[in-house]
Amino acid sequence: MLQRVSRRFPSLRRCGLRTASTVPTNQAQPGEVEEEVSATVKRIRSELAADKQKLKWRTPIGDRPEDWNSKLKLFSNAEQTSDFIVMMQKPIDLSPRNIRQWWENREERIERHMQQFVPERHKILGAELAAAHFILYRGGAVKFINDTHWRRASKDGEFKLPNKFDPRYKVEALRCDNMELYYEGLENLRCLDSLKFLSFHNVKSFDDWCLDRISGGGFPNLEVLDLSCTQITSNGLACLYRFPKLKLLILNDPKETLELELSTVMLEEAMPALKIVGADAIHS
């Protein structure tokens, strides 16, 4: 019946279609949605750019257009640190003591730079030989697996080691005693899977930060660690849990302070195979 009515009144059907097309709805057209989204994205981006501009650090003095610049600015240090600023604010002191201190600080900065990790050296030599070259060049001693003696550099600083990777050389022990070794240079001691003995006896610059770096160097088989005559405190001993096979730890005096004694007792309790002794029992 409805079909007959629709055939009899075709005009009514056309009118209904026109009415439906003109009735307002809550759904937006696809083009309108895209325009609204793009406008919102543009607004958010503009707000983020404005916020970044507000949060940006102030322009350094001398880089602003209204600042006066001297011709000597060509010789200024672009990376001026707080130490440099403090130095420039101090009165000029040309006393022998101050000149000697300045020279020592300069030599230390140069040595720290020279001890930095060189990726190319490790790519050519491998981790084992790269560590051996680094230690021998600075007056240390190295012992490889199946070697019957320690290897040291001659008086002229020369030593015989391969100048490219050789899988037969596996470092078993390292002696860094009395060396001038800094935090930057410790990164050269890494991934020594066969290392069992490591000594930093009388390395004055070796502190808790250095021990933390060494503990993350990847020495899974380390058994003996000598930290006597260094700047190690009770705070640095907490990272020794990273040496699961550590059996002997040498310190100046495990009972030097109450904090150090408590730390050593807790460390021995956490690592039953570990024995902590004083330097007098080893280096006497």
Swiss-Prot record:
Gene3D superfamilies: Ribonuclease Inhibitor. It comes from the Eukaryota. InterPro entries: LRR_dom_sf. One of its GO terms (cellular component) is mitochondrion. One of its GO terms (biological process) is mitochondrial respiratory chain complex I assembly. Belongs to the ATP synthase subunit s family. Associates with mitochondrial complex I assembly intermediates during its biogenesis. Involved in the assembly of the mitochondrial membrane respiratory chain NADH dehydrogenase (Complex I). This is Distal membrane arm assembly component 2. It comes from Drosophila melanogaster (Fruit fly).
